[in-house]
């Protein structure tokens, strides 16, 4: 790495590697971690060394050197305590790294990056980039050397309230671990004499020339549920909320969306239910259909009244029955369809009956969906149960029972039937029947739609559009914002923008900093004040991303101006269900954002940043390109 100071990518790659090397299961405190990463990346040029002194580089070097040495037990990386990022693992013989360059602690020069309000928001107990003293790791998993020698008492081992750390309090190091596990250094330190807690060197600093002995400040409150992380970048990389919601966003929310359409798609169902014996139909309790005299003395003496539950049809192919308040609650329509039991003498489509013999029975195909379901008919003195021919586009799974109020309509027990086309011998309907049957409905036109029904259907339509069809360039997972609650990280804790704590924003707000006016030529006023503060375009998606919105959010993107848009460090990778964040320059983009005017937004070096350099006239090219280069050199 001869040009180490120029090779910014090496650092980011090392950071990514350290992210990968560490377990992703820890719980982080979002506020301080986000700030710490940003203050690190923002300030890294304020000290001379770029790569060799960088914590990630040290970390990688010490990992490489310690991995080889056989005599020392490696603590599992997820448990490695904080300082092992900077120092070689303490268990081995103390190795002094080649270059002890500056650590990126919060020195007075970089402290100016914090505005006053931020300094109040974050009391001194939250450590900035590398901690100047040991921070207690959690031993919840397996005992590691680093954890039981840590500077503070940890809550799993010491429950005695008198032993909780005060600054000058004496306590015995824990002797519960079997000596076999302990390294010699650990035994030496945990033998029977008492050590004042504040005068012990922290185990990682033990006889290494790195830091002076650290005196821990008294710890105000420490919640044992927040375990402090391992490598600085891995640790700062994401917090609990964002991590879980990244996962949930991609899996759970998507499947929640899909749940309503779990009513199977037409193609699947038709093959699944055609001629199926009742064992395959999702458990429908046996229907008791009451057959009774038609009061209106119509041509047939018997008629069957079925409750009609009109379900929202996810495929949208059956327009006639799109009327339910939501895809999940099926509200029964007040309409009844009268079904006349068939005569055996009729000639029609074959129907498999339950008892096994075939009965002929006419079907009117294609008008309503007929879910296979037994209808009791009285016929030749004995009742056989017929299956009506099935064209299921719209199976209903519902547990509501509809109790009709008028005495004419019988109560039907069991799960209500889906819309069924009346099966009849000669005449199609009896217009005189008390329940005003639907007259030969074609699926395209709904039968007597009330205004309310129409409105409901329109809403369904809209919701389905939003949920099912992915909008241009935005994923279904992202559209989940429309129906689910917005991504938790869409509203950061301090209710400022996601970028408010980045060093860029900080120095801009305080009016200081070299790059304040860097883009003033190219930046519209709106980009400075409003958009970058309120609605960051890179991530997270706005609470309700709609197609129209997507274009509007990008208006300043083409000015090539906004630096946050160009490459946001804190953008969790939303692709491929990945759980952590990677700090490499990835080729992917934030989910619902159309491609930038120039080819690759996340470039490997500042030159390819402007992929379209050829397009500019030479004069313009010089100025703009120089600005970009300067900006990147300073920032990254």
Curated annotation (Swiss-Prot):
Residues 111-205, 222-284, 313-387, 400-451, 467-550, 572-604 are annotated as: Disordered. Its main location: cytoplasm. Component of eisosomes, large cytoplasmic protein assemblies that localize to specialized domains termed MCCs on the plasma membrane. Keywords: Cytoplasm. Residues 1-297 are annotated as: Required for targeting the protein to eisosomes. Coiled coil: none annotated. It is found in: Cytoplasm, Cell cortex; Cell tip. The lineage of its organism: Eukaryota, Fungi, Dikarya, Ascomycota, Taphrinomycotina. Residues 503-512 have a biased composition (Basic and acidic residues). Residues 355-383, 471-484 have a biased composition (Low complexity). GO terms for biological process: plasma membrane organization. Residues 131-159, 166-178, 188-204, 237-255, 315-354, 400-412, 422-439, 572-589 have a biased composition (Polar residues). Important for the biogenesis of filamentous eisosomes, large cytoplasmic protein assemblies that localize to specialized domains on the plasma membrane to cluster specific proteins at sites of membrane invaginations. GO terms for cellular component: cell cortex of cell tip; eisosome filament. This is Eisosome protein sle1. It comes from the Eukaryota.
């Amino acid at each position: 790495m001869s040009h180490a100071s120029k090779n910014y990518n090496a650092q980011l790659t090392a950071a990514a590697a350290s992210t990968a090397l560490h377990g992703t299961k820890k719980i982080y405190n979002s506020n301080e971690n986000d700030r710490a990463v940003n203050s690190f990346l923002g300030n890294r040029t304020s000290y001379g060394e770029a790569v060799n002194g960088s914590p990630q580089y040290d970390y990688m070097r010490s990992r490489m050197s310690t991995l080889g040495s056989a005599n020392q037990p490696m603590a599992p990386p997820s448990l490695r305590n904080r300082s092992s990022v900077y120092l070689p693992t303490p268990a081995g013989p103390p190795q002094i790294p080649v270059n002890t360059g500056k650590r990126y602690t919060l020195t007075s020069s970089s402290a100016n990056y914090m505005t006053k309000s931020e300094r109040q928001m974050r009391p001194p107990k939250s450590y900035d980039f590398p901690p100047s003293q040991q921070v207690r790791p959690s031993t919840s998993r397996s005992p590691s050397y680093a954890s039981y020698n840590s500077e503070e008492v940890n809550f799993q081992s010491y429950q005695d309230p008198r032993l909780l750390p005060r600054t000058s309090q004496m306590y015995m190091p824990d002797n519960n671990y079997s000596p076999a596990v302990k390294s010699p250094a650990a035994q030496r330190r945990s033998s029977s004499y008492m050590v004042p807690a504040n005068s012990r060197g922290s185990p990682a600093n033990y006889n290494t020339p790195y830091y002076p002995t650290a005196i821990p400040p008294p710890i105000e409150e420490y919640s044992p549920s927040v375990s402090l992380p391992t490598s600085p970048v891995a640790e700062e990389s994401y917090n609990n909320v964002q991590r879980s919601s990244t996962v949930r966003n991609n899996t759970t929310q998507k499947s929640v969306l899909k749940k309503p359409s779990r009513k199977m798609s037409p193609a699947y169902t038709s093959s699944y239910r055609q001629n199926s014996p009742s064992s395959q139909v999702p458990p429908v309790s046996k229907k008791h259909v009451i057959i009774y005299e038609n009061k209106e003395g119509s041509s047939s003496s018997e008629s069957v009244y079925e409750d009609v539950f009109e379900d929202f049809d996810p495929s949208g192919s059956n327009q006639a029955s799109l009327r339910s308040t939501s895809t999940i609650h099926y509200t029964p329509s007040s309409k009844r369809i009268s079904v006349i039991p068939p005569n055996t003498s009729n000639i029609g489509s074959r129907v498999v009956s339950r008892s096994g013999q075939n009965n002929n029975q006419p079907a009117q195909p294609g008008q309503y969906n007929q879910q296979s379901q037994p209808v009791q008919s009285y016929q030749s003195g004995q009742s056989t149960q017929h299956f009506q021919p099935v064209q299921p586009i719209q199976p209903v799974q519902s547990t509501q029972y509809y109790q009709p109020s008028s005495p004419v309509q019988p109560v039907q027990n069991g799960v209500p039937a889906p819309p069924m086309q009346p099966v009849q011998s000669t005449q199609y309907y009896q217009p005189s029947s008390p329940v005003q049957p639907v007259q030969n409905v074609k699926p395209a036109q709904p039968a007597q739609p009330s205004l309310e029904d129409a409105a409901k259907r329109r809403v369904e339509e809209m919701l389905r559009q939003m949920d099912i069809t992915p909008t241009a360039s935005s994923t279904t997972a992202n559209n989940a914002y429309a129906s689910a609650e917005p991504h938790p990280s869409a509203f950061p804790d301090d209710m400022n923008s996601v970028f408010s704590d980045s060093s860029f924003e900080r120095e801009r707000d305080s009016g200081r900093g070299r790059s304040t006016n860097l883009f003033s030529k190219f930046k519209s006023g709106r980009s400075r004040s409003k958009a970058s503060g309120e609605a960051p375009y890179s991530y997270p998606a706005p609470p309700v991303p709609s197609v129209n919105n997507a274009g509007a959010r990008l208006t300043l993107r083409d000015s090539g101006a906004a630096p946050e848009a160009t490459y946001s460090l804190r953008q969790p990778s939303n692709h491929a269900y990945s759980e952590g964040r990677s700090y490499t320059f990835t080729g992917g983009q934030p989910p619902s954002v159309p491609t930038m005017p120039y080819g690759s937004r996340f470039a490997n070096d500042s030159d390819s940043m402007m992929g379209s350099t050829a397009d500019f006239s030479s004069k313009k090219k010089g100025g703009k390109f120089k600005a970009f280069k300067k900006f990147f050199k300073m920032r990254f």
